[in-house]
């Protein structure tokens, strides 16, 4: 009986071991294989913009999907220098992120002398839409989510928690507003007004850029710049996107503009092993509550500030 149990345990261990091994083998294969859309020396550059948009590379946690303006702009400049490349496709699946990083990418796209098209496949909201608006043409899936033209600032406040456990916050500052946004004290009316003023300014820049990029009246953009998101069909009616469709419509538009068959090559940022492993893990995993997790990650990395994002 005991021998039989040992045999079962050995069998279970072997099955678990083989499962883990096959999982990591599939990850390694995905790291070193190319998608069917990629070819060498193509005339159309494909650049992915996925996850949270940040300014500097390598600031995310191991399994956090992020796009850095620093890396994306390098890819745009690289494609722009390539005389063979006639057009750039920006494949977007992002909820937005840093206002600064979003504007940096949008400005870099506008500098290029190539045909540019933004492809919102699933999500292209807030800062990601800001980026999309800078392209010559926007194609979005009819059920995709886009728009959400607005700015948000938030922080976790622990003042009530400290008070409950009889912990005091000793405030020693030189400059009355030096600790503005500290999670260990409540915002004063003056501090709240200052933050709201900054948010209003960033929101105005956002609206102004969208209106200019999309050739819309500023007043019309202001009416829909409530932070609300729109599905693709609604966005088309509002003039936020040019065309409803998918990969086929994107390629058709590009070929009409460049006058030749599209030969697409994916421009990708260089990855170290852990970065590549992170992406592969993201592609093979489903994270429940990712938005909530990102909020707590941001606070964990920057506990003494209010983060402003689009």
What spans do the regions from the language model cover?
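Active-site loop architecture of trypsin-fold serine endopeptidases
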Residues: 143-151
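N-terminal organellar transit peptides
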Residues: 1-118, 123-127, 137-140, 153-310
């Amino acid at each position: 009986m005991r021998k039989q149990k040992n045999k079962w345990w050995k069998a279970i261990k072997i099955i678990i071991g083989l499962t883990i091994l096959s999982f990591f083998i599939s990850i390694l294969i995905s790291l070193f294989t190319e998608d069917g859309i990629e070819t060498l020396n193509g005339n159309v550059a494909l650049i992915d913009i996925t996850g949270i948009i940040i300014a500097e590379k390598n600031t995310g946690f191991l399994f956090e999907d992020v796009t850095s303006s620093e890396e994306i702009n390098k890819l745009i400049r690289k494609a722009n220098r390539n005389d063979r490349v006639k057009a750039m496709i920006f494949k977007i699946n992002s909820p937005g992120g840093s206002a600064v990083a979003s504007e940096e990418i949008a400005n870099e796209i506008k500098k290029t002398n190539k045909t540019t098209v933004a492809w919102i496949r699933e999500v292209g909201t807030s800062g990601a839409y800001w980026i999309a608006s800078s392209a010559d043409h926007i194609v979005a899936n009819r059920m995709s989510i886009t728009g959400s033209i607005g700015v948000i600032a938030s922080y976790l406040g622990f003042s009530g928690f400290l008070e409950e456990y009889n912990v005091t916050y000793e405030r020693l500052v030189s400059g009355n507003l030096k600790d503005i946004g500290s999670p260990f004290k409540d915002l004063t009316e003056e501090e709240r007004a200052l933050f709201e003023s900054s948010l209003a300014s960033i929101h105005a820049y956002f609206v102004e850029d969208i209106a200019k990029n999309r050739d819309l009246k500023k007043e019309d953009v202001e009416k829909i710049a409530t932070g609300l998101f729109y599905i693709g069909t609604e966005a088309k009616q509002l003039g936020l996107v040019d065309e409803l469709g998918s990969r086929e419509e994107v390629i058709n538009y590009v070929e009409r503009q460049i006058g030749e068959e599209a030969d697409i090559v994916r421009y990708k940022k260089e990855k170290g092993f852990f970065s590549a492993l992170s992406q592969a893990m993201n592609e093979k995993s489903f994270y429940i509550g990712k938005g909530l997790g990102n909020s707590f990650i941001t606070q964990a990395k920057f506990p003494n500030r209010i983060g402003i994002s689009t």
